[in-house]
UniProtKB/Swiss-Prot annotation:
Assembly description: Hetero-, homo- or pseudo-homodimer (identical sequence, different post-translational modifications).
Annotated protein name in UniProt: Alpha-conotoxin-like Ms20.2
Signal peptide range: 1-24
GO cellular component assignments: extracellular region; host cell postsynaptic membrane
Subcellular compartments: Secreted
Tissue specificity remark: Expressed by the venom duct.
Family statement: Belongs to the conotoxin D superfamily.
Alphabetic keyword roster: Acetylcholine receptor inhibiting toxin, Disulfide bond, Gamma-carboxyglutamic acid, Hydroxylation, Ion channel impairing toxin, Neurotoxin, Postsynaptic neurotoxin, Secreted, Signal, Toxin
Organism the protein comes from: Conus mustelinus
Keyword match ATP-binding: no
4-carboxyglutamate found at: 48
4-hydroxyproline sites (modified residues): 54
Chain's role: Alpha-conotoxins act on postsynaptic membranes, they bind to the nicotinic acetylcholine receptors (nAChR) and thus inhibit them. Through its two C-terminal domains, this homodimeric protein would bind to two nAChR allosteric sites, located outside the nAChR C-loop of the principal binding face and at the adjacent binding interface in a clockwise direction. This toxin specifically blocks mammalian neuronal nAChR of the alpha-7/CHRNA7, alpha-3-beta-2/CHRNA3-CHRNB2 and alpha-4-beta-2/CHRNA4-CHRNB2 subtypes.
Length: 93
């Protein structure tokens, strides 16, 4: 019974190393690219950001799974996850 309990504890704790508290992938994780592609499919794609804090690179308006509470400062940009580089803005031309 002790082995089963220990195995359950390990299985519950192990995923915590792959994700931070916000549900976002920890940078440098080998699984991050697949999760980023999953989050960008269909209706899970991030919504357009609105300027919240002029003059700063991030505001607090994009409450999506991918960018958490971060948002791009420019209008028309979207918050994206770049494999091995983390979260950033994708802005039109």
């Amino acid at each position: 019974m002790l082995k089963l309990e220990m195995m359950l504890v390990v299985l519950l704790i192990l995923p915590l190393f792959y994700f931070d508290a916000g549900g976002q992938v920890v940078q440098g994780d080998w699984r991050s690219d697949g999760l980023a592609r999953y989050l960008q499919r269909g209706d899970r794609d991030v919504r357009e950001c609105n300027i919240n804090t002029p003059g700063s690179s991030w505001g607090k308006c994009c409450l999506t799974r991918m960018c958490g509470t971060m948002c791009c400062a420019r209008s028309g940009c979207t918050c994206v996850y770049h494999w091995r580089r983390g979260h950033g803005c994708s802005c039109p031309g």
